[in-house]
Amino acid sequence: MTKVSVDDEFIKFSYSSPMIRSCLLDAGCLLELHTYYTREESGRYSDCRVGVHIDWDGVINGQEIDVENEIDVMLLEGVVPVFISCKNGRVNQMALYELDAVANRFGGKYVRKELAATQEITPGYLKRAEEMGIVVCMEK
């Protein structure tokens, strides 16, 4: 932040760039970046990407609305794809089903699925994740 000023009623400041502003205002963005950097720095992965958009039919439809999903963090460990969904709030059933559906459709037979979460997950959702082959990672 730049141009910080404080008085009795207000704290005023400017962001150093639009990207920094976006990251600081979107808590999910920070979790995605944290997850990305920790995985990338591990050295286990040959490729690491954040915010990957996947087009379900692979056809570019111009201006028309197309069915897309975003994978928060996508990795390759050798030839094994790893799909990671980051949840900064409560994890619900839809989060698990979306990760499972997208990873199974585009990841192939050996895909690995991870859910990076910041809040505790209920035992029922943890069991469901285990049944779906989703590894839950608690991020701090």
What residues fall within each predicted segment?
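Intrinsically disordered, low-complexity Ser/Thr/Pro/Gly-rich regulatory segments
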Residues: 1-140
